[in-house]
Amino acid sequence: MRCRTHLVFSNVVALGLIQPNNVKDLVVCMTAATVGGIVSDLDIRTSDKHKAVDLMVFLFFSLLVLGYYFDIKYNYGLFNMIGNSKYYLNVIGMFVFLGICFYGMHQPHRSFLHSFLGIFLLTGTLYYCFNVIWFPFLLGMLSHIFLDIFNKRPLRLLYPLKYGFSLKLCNYNSPVDTWVFIISIICLGLELYIL
């Protein structure tokens, strides 16, 4: 399935199950479901998402190193302040989440980021550090994997085991993908109208 299909379908699933009752919850739900719906394809070497995450990881670590350097040199106490605040877990969580994504990006496509292990590690990190977004993120990831099971290329759900699973009913750019996308757009529109 294409990225656009995963993006829309993940939101249909998350909004249908969570049914947020205000704009803030709607935005949080849709954002987390969108990230969950496309994070599994970070391992596609040619994708723009792969390049964007490479850049984000590089910038994040560069800023962290620069921040630490200036914190020590000028004695700002920034890292002590973060360590003593409630945001400490959030910073650690971002670190761990990006590290897991970075690891997954460098694995073969449809392996780690399409596995139960990948789902558990990414969702577990969010549950522990950002517990507001873990459930829509999980629904987004599960919806991605659900759609990809119908593809001809197998998913390594039990990664690191080599065995893959696939129903072999469609391929990447098939009419099935187009129909799932169109039906998902209609459902998303209806859900947003009802909410």
Regions found by a protein language model. Give the residues of each.
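N-terminal membrane-targeting hydrophobic helices
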Residues: 1-195
